[in-house]
Design a protein with these regions (language model features):
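Fe(II)/2-oxoglutarate oxygenase catalytic core
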Residues: 1-140
Length: 140
């Protein structure tokens, strides 16, 4: 029997070298404690770095090639695997990922605050959420 939980895992979708490049960019920004947004730099108070990587004309691209590769891989995995399993998504309105944040969580840490994935007008049309884990399983 096929399970339809909506939660899927696609191991090794992104190559190790690509993940290392994202970590390198994260570490540079974390060291400087800055977060880029569309119009300015902001001092970041936690361990989350927001890259406004949405693939649209009006938003800032921190590193175009890094972002473009991320969204191409995400799109390929989504259309070739996820949508094939969840056929109802083929009948939904056109949708695309918007923005990306990177957060470093040490072993036994995580995002434990209650939250909603469609909490405001900016996220109210969200169709799905995705996560890319950059650590090895042994790291926790």
């Amino acid at each position: 029997m096929t399970e339809y939980s909506g939660i899927e895992v696609y191991p090794n979708t992104y190559e190790k070298e690509y993940c290392e490049e994202i970590i390198k960019h994260f570490n540079v920004m974390a060291r400087n404690k800055v977060t880029y947004n569309q119009n300015n730099l902001e001092v970041n108070q936690d361990n989350r770095i927001v890259f406004d990587w949405a693939h649209t004309q009006s938003q800032y691209h921190y590193d175009y090639n890094l972002c473009d590769y991320f969204y191409k891989k995400l799109h390929d995995t989504y259309t070739e695997q996820y949508m094939e399993k969840y056929q109802m998504l083929k009948q939904s309105e056109q949708h695309s990922p918007k923005g990306m944040s990177i957060q470093k969580s040490l072993p036994h840490q995580g995002y434990h605050a209650w939250h909603a994935e469609a909490a405001d007008i900016g996220s109210s049309s969200r169709v799905m959420n995705y996560m890319l884990y950059l650590n090895d399983v042994e790291d926790g």
